[in-house]
Amino acid sequence: MNKPLQQLPSPQLLNQVNDYIINRKNKRHESKRWIHYCLFLLCWKAGLRVSEAINFDYNLEHPAPEYKGLYLLRGKGSKERYVYIAPQIIKVLKSHNWQPQQTNRINFFEFLREAKENLHIPAHIELAPHTLRRCFATYNALNGMPLPVLQNVLGHANVRTTALYVKASRLENLLKFKPI
């Protein structure tokens, strides 16, 4: 049986998820809400893999002033790279006392699944940790970031992997933005 085509959420929908997380009332025993919000921002706005986001340490900023905003990241296969994290995201992380390894990927996945249900996001629109990374890649590719640069930002060993993200996003956008 063929799996139906999953569509990436639009930037507007991700802003809606962002607002939902910020504005919803606290539930009892909901200690990880802000941790998950920080993960949401790191995956969506910085393009980190969920494992990279969980282990992100804002104390590992590049020491040189000309590289302010670049943070050392230990990525897939224990490879190290520098990634840019916007000052606004660092401010949010600090305001919520972010520490590496406060949660796990399963809890974050469940958090996003619950947000999708509560926002009544249609089944054909995917909302998962890796989807946020794909949205980051898609947005930057469609806004002119060269593929080799995007490859480095995402930490892909092969540019073909990055090209698959972009190809998939273009196919989805053909469906989303059909000409009249």
Q: Where are the regions a protein language model picked out?
A:
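Flexible interdomain linker/hinge and immediately adjacent N-terminus
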Residues: 1-19, 97-98
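Basic, Lys/Arg- and aromatic-enriched nucleic-acid-binding interface segment
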Residues: 12-46
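Active-site/catalytic core of tyrosine-dependent DNA strand-transfer enzymes
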Residues: 14, 86-124
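Short, basic (Lys/Arg/His-rich) helix/loop patches that form interaction surfaces
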Residues: 23-30, 112-152
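Alpha-helix N-cap/helix-start motif at helix boundaries, enriched for small hydrophobics
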Residues: 39, 47, 51-56, 150
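Conserved tyrosine-mediated DNA breakage-rejoining catalytic core shared by Y-recombinases
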Residues: 55-91
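Short, polar N-cap/turn motifs at the start of nucleic acid-interacting alpha helices
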Residues: 62-64, 146-166, 171
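DNA/chromatin major-groove-contacting recognition/catalytic segments
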Residues: 84, 88, 168-180
